[in-house]
């Protein structure tokens, strides 16, 4: 898979958009099976709930509601493990436009409407399928969406969330590498040593786009261990 750079130099310091990078052949071959938009939670029936519901928030400027990087890769791995019929995949879309400007919003690092949309989806999962295992993920600005939304959920809904994987977490320094008010044992953070975003800045370096291997391997393994 390759990514298209669509950000000008003037805004590159705050962008979380994919740029063109080469990936290994195994990951690249996933492209044909992945979709940038998934809405199984919203469209699925409560009479046919799956084993797993995966909710994901994409990076800035990524297309659809899942993007074309970490989210679909993790989704594919979960579907391969549990079977497509036993995994509902849902991207955070609608009010969450994944725009660049929202990265500047302090202290959340994303918009209030985006946070509320993610909270709505977690609540929907709980009301529609309370016995399904909910897992979640985010990439770049999407990690800010997930961190804020999950931290504001009721304990009942938080308890249904079995695990969360966050890649290139934009609030890593500010949140001390965790989701506030949420169990650290349920959270896995992937932040590359060379990714400046992980140190409390919005400087975008090449390492910010190199999380596909984690998304294909360690992230789904962590979630599967939490799901059981």
UniProtKB/Swiss-Prot annotation:
Site (Transition state stabilizer): 60, 141
PTM per Swiss-Prot/TrEMBL: The 2 disulfide bonds play a critical role in holding the catalytic residues in juxta-position; reduction of the disulfide bridges results in the complete inactivation of the enzyme.
Active site positions, chain numbering: 140 (nucleophile), 195, 208 (proton donor/acceptor)
EC code: 3.1.1.74
Keyword ATP-binding included in the entry's annotation: no
Chief place of localization: secreted
Pfam family, one: Cutinase
PROSITE patterns per record: CUTINASE_1, CUTINASE_2
GO terms for MF: cutinase activity
GO cellular component term, pick one: extracellular region
Regulation: Partially inhibited by berberine; higher inhibitory effects are observed with longer chain polyester substrates.
Compartment(s) of residence: Secreted
GO biological process: carbohydrate catabolic process
Signal sequence region: 1-16
Disulfide bond entries: 49-129, 191-198
Family (UniProt): Belongs to the cutinase family.
Entry function: Catalyzes the hydrolysis of complex carboxylic polyesters found in the cell wall of plants. Degrades cutin, a macromolecule that forms the structure of the plant cuticle. Allows pathogenic fungi to penetrate through the cuticular barrier into the host plant during the initial stage of fungal infection.
Protein's name according to its UniProt entry: Cutinase
UniProt organism field: Colletotrichum truncatum
